[in-house]
């Protein structure tokens, strides 16, 4: 008797695997839970496709997101890479300030709208962006090189030799018994 039950079970299992099932179809419990969840909480990404949003194209809402950056230090210097897809050389500005700040800015111009155009989707951003970086003391500010290739702006900054790195300057404080002006460590007067 036990052997007949096993044979019947085996037969039903084989038929079920062959897509000619004699057994009623039942979802696994996890699928039933997922269906219950999806009925109560629809996929937020699919919902957004069906809501009739107007396309808001004002400059404040379409400001460019900041450029993504990778910055690495090598034995020879520093390399900063920024993603600026679709921008031309003329649309990007690289500045180095005396306070050791490197600033990269740019602007993607808004595409001209022609009469009769109907926008279905606007995802690319336009407008201005800027990123700035405080450079370490070992960077030679006069050695900054920039190269734009395949939408990636690569900035290369050489390192100063250890003997050329300027440390903080000590300023003497004058009191009642000292002359007016600032003195350096040698006692000589210097301009600030």
From Swiss-Prot:
GO terms for biological process: protein complex oligomerization; protein folding; response to heat; response to hydrogen peroxide; response to salt stress. The keyword Transferase does not apply. CDD domains: ACD_ScHsp26_like. Keywords: Endoplasmic reticulum, Signal, Stress response. Belongs to the small heat shock protein (HSP20) family. Forms oligomeric structures. This is 22.0 kDa class IV heat shock protein. The lineage of its organism: Eukaryota, Viridiplantae, Streptophyta, Embryophyta, Tracheophyta.
């Amino acid at each position: 008797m036990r052997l007949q039950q096993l044979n019947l079970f085996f037969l039903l299992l084989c038929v079920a695997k062959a897509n000619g099932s004699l057994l009623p179809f039942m979802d696994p419990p996890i699928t039933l839970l997922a269906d219950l969840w999806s009925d109560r909480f629809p996929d937020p990404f699919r919902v957004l496709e069906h809501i009739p949003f107007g396309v808001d194209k004002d400059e404040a809402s379409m400001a460019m997101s900041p450029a993504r950056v990778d910055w690495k230090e090598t034995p020879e210097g520093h390399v900063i890479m920024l993603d600026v897809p679709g921008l031309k050389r003329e649309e990007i500005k690289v500045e180095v300030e005396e306070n050791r700040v490197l600033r990269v800015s740019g602007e993607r111009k808004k595409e001209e709208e022609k009469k009769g155009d109907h926008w279905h989707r606007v995802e690319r951003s336009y407008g201005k962006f800027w990123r700035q970086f405080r450079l370490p003391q070992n960077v030679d500010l006069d050695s900054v090189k920039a190269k734009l290739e395949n939408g990636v702006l690569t900035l290369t900054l050489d390192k100063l030799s250890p003997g050329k790195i300027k440390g903080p300057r000590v300023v003497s404080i004058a009191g009642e018994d000292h002359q007016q002006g600032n003195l350096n460590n040698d006692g000589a007067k210097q301009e600030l």
